[in-house]
């Protein structure tokens, strides 16, 4: 990338191009090809999908660059990769590999418990998770070009993604209704930068796209998130932890596109086989809740 391609306007525009699509987690070239053939608009290259990261425990880090390069060489669609929150070097390594987007992700073990990356220092666009408008606005102020709900990754349980999408959208409506002289107090109470809130008020929406992520496991889940206002869908473990990844991938892409066509979604949901095994959120210990990572 050149410095020109690294401007905020261009980076946000690149993320906007993925709007309405599905981004799938993959761990090798074979999975990347399945995702591309199913109609994914991009893939996320990593060593393990979130369900396996959750099961393995321990410290989870950036993927081996060999895996990232293997995926990049296998598909023509954009390739994303994850770095740990606050890990300056992992982000620079991924940028040097030529990935199309970097996800500063709570799925991996945070490297810094105080600071997120200053994403404006990079030419590559960044994706970040959020649960509310405070987190969303802080990530935007840091230079994030795309947001996604945090949900609860690797659970196959959509409830947290629904909660986060509804929360962000409700707070956007609240910001839009405030007078400008009321925004400063709102900024103080939420930790949201005032200038970003002004931009949200002026636009009536976030200035970057906001995808759904964290728990999407079925075509109906994907359609639900689109109806709640998501600009697109990330699917982590839901594809390749299902009984039939090829069928699930195609069905989720179709349901994301035609999210109000209930007869089609019913048809897409027939004969898919078992979805990934789900996890009840209330059974997770506080330290197992990935959505709590980041600030």
Swiss-Prot record:
Q: How does it assemble?
A: In the presence of PdxT, forms a dodecamer of heterodimers.
Name this protein carries in UniProt: Pyridoxal 5'-phosphate synthase subunit PdxS
Q: Tell me what reaction this enzyme catalyses.
A: aldehydo-D-ribose 5-phosphate + D-glyceraldehyde 3-phosphate + L-glutamine = pyridoxal 5'-phosphate + L-glutamate + phosphate + 3 H2O + H(+)
Any GO BP: amino acid metabolic process
Organism, scientific name: Bacillus cereus (strain ATCC 14579 / DSM 31 / CCUG 7414 / JCM 2152 / NBRC 15305 / NCIMB 9373 / NCTC 2599 / NRRL B-3711)
Q: Which residues bind D-ribose 5-phosphate?
A: 25, 154, 215, 236-237
Tell me which InterPro entries the record gives: Aldolase_TIM (IPR013785), PdxS/SNZ (IPR001852), PdxS/SNZ_N (IPR033755), RibuloseP-bd_barrel (IPR011060)
Q: What is the lineage of its organism?
A: Bacteria, Bacillati, Bacillota, Bacilli, Bacillales
Keyword line: Lyase, Pyridoxal phosphate, Schiff base
The gene for this chain is: pdxS
Q: Which residues hold D-glyceraldehyde 3-phosphate?
A: 166
Report the top EC class in one word. Answer: lyase
